[in-house]
């Protein structure tokens, strides 16, 4: 696994900070600066010092680049995406994930309509009229999936999370509301069923804490990914679109760590909600639901 500091140098450029300034302010050695420039490993102490200086997280300045493993699902999805193979795993997953993830959130499009939109890039409505938002969010979800595949091996960070939300909600009626903040954290309180979520003013701090806690784990397991999802949903960082953004994140992290991903279909929706609610008391509810979804 190789390390890349491309994102660090992008931040420095945006902040108009030169390498020599960084070296001087943090008292870095020339050898350390050279390692950063050549994408070589540096100490965690150095990374923390840089993050504190730039007010960011480790995932904001570095990413791990995996060697290509042609036996993984991710490699196959990337190849099928590139080749635009009809009927492939990539093709079917695009349709099933978009349909089911949107359906959980109230979309009234059928799976056949979702398939038609994906395969023809047109809208085929024979009976009932469809919501423009349902159509836009379906199209946007296809783009979210492509973005997720392209970024799957990157370290999970705030940029990926916010960009996913921005893609999902672009050109929807929500995006035209001045307070909605597409691709940014919420500005108004929201709720999940009867549960209070994190107040807008505390979202940034709680998301930073969640990401740092998650990225600090030595080996990411299936339960770690589920735990992140539960905590993400409880924070509910965006005004709307949290569930779909959260499920894209889960799919990404499963691909990154070569864990078989899953799609929550309608018959498992209530079990999924129960699992989210009862995670602190019984992790088996959500774990078993997701494992069942994986086998369907």
Give the role of each language-model region.
Residues 13, 24, 52:
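Alpha-helical residues within the helix-turn-helix
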Residues 27-42:
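Recognition helix of helix-turn-helix/homeodomain-like DNA-binding domains
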């Amino acid at each position: 696994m190789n390390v890349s500091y491309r994102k660090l140098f992008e931040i420095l450029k945006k902040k108009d900070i030169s390498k020599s300034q960084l070296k001087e302010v943090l008292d870095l050695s020339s050898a350390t600066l050279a390692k950063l420039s050549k994408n070589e490993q540096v100490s965690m102490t150095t990374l923390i010092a840089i993050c504190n200086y730039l007010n960011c997280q480790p995932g904001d300045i570095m990413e791990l680049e995996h060697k290509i493993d042609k036996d993984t699902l991710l490699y196959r999805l990337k190849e099928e995406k590139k080749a635009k193979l009809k009927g492939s795993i990539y093709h079917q997953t695009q349709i099933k994930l978009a349909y089911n993830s949107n359906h959980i959130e109230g979309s009234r499009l059928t799976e056949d309509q979702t398939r038609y939109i994906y395969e023809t890039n047109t809208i085929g409505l024979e009976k009932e009229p469809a919501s423009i938002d349902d159509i836009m969010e379906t199209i946007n979800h296809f783009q979210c999936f492509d973005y997720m595949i392209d970024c799957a091996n990157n370290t999970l960070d705030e940029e990926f999370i916010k960009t996913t939300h921005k893609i999902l909600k672009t050109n929807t009626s929500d995006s035209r509301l001045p307070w909605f903040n597409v691709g940014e954290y919420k500005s108004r309180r929201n709720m999940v069923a009867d549960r209070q979520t994190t107040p807008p003013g505390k979202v940034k701090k709680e998301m930073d804490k969640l990401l740092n806690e998650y990225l600090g784990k030595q080996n990411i397991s299936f339960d770690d990914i589920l735990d992140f999802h539960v905590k993400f949903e409880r924070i509910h960082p965006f005004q709307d679109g949290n569930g779909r953004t959260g499920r894209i994140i889960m799919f990404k992290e499963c691909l990154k760590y070569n864990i078989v991903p899953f799609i929550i279909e309608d018959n498992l929706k209530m079990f999924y909600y129960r699992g989210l609610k009862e995670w602190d008391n019984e992790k088996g509810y959500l774990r078993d639901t997701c494992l069942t979804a994986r086998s369907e």
